[in-house]
Amino acid sequence: MNNIFERSIGLLGEGNFNLIQQKVIAVFGLGGVGGTALEALARTGFKHFILVDFDKVDASNLNRQILYTQKDIGRNKVDAAKDRILSINPNCEIQTILAKAQDFDSNQPIDFIVDAIDDVDGKLFLLRLAQENNIPQIMSLGMANRFECEVVHVTKLNKTHSDPLAKKVRYLVKKSGLEVGNVNVVISEEIPQKNAEKLYSTMIVPSCAGLTIAKYILNSIIDNK
C-alpha cells in the first residue's frame, strides 16, 4: 500500500511519513471545510481518524463538499465519508460517531482536533475538550458568502476581525473562562457579502480552508516531533 504514498514519502521523508501514520485526527463536521481537510490528510498519509457528524448528505451539499456524490444523498455523512476515505486507502482505521460535537464521548486518544462545525455551543465544547486535555486544535470560522482564497489563513482567535462568527465565538470563549489567546483558527479576512440572506458558497473558499487546516496539522506534527 505504500506505493500509493510514494510521492508523500519522497517529500516528507520516511521518518515524518511514519510519524503522521501514527497520529489520530478527530474531525468534527464533514462539510465543505472538514471534508476537504479529511481527504487531504488521508491522501497525504494520515490513516487514523475519528469522524463526528450528525447530519445526512443533502443534494445541496454536492456543489462544495468533496466527499459526496449523487449516490450518497440521504446517507449519514459519517458513513459516506468513511467509505470515501477507505476507497482511497483501505488501510485507514476510522471510527465514526453519529452525533453533534457536544455529545461526543470517546476514550480513544486524540492527537489533533479539527473543528469544522457551525454550532457555537459545539465549538465551545471542543475548545474545552482540547484545553482540558492538552490536545492541539484548529477551529474553522466563517467561510460562507465569500469568494477569495488568497485571504484564508491561520491565526489566533484574539487576532481575528471582520468575521461575525469569530466575534461571537471570541466573546463566548472569554465568558466561559477559556483561554482565547491560544485558540488556533482558520479565518478569511474577506468581509462576507452583506446582501446574502443565507449562507451561500461554492467549493472554492471552504475547500481552501480545509486545505489550510490539513497543511497546518501536517506542519504542526512534523515541527513538534
Regions found by a protein language model. Give the residues of each.
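Glycine-rich phosphate/adenylate-binding loop
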Residues: 108-112, 117-125, 132-133, 137, ...
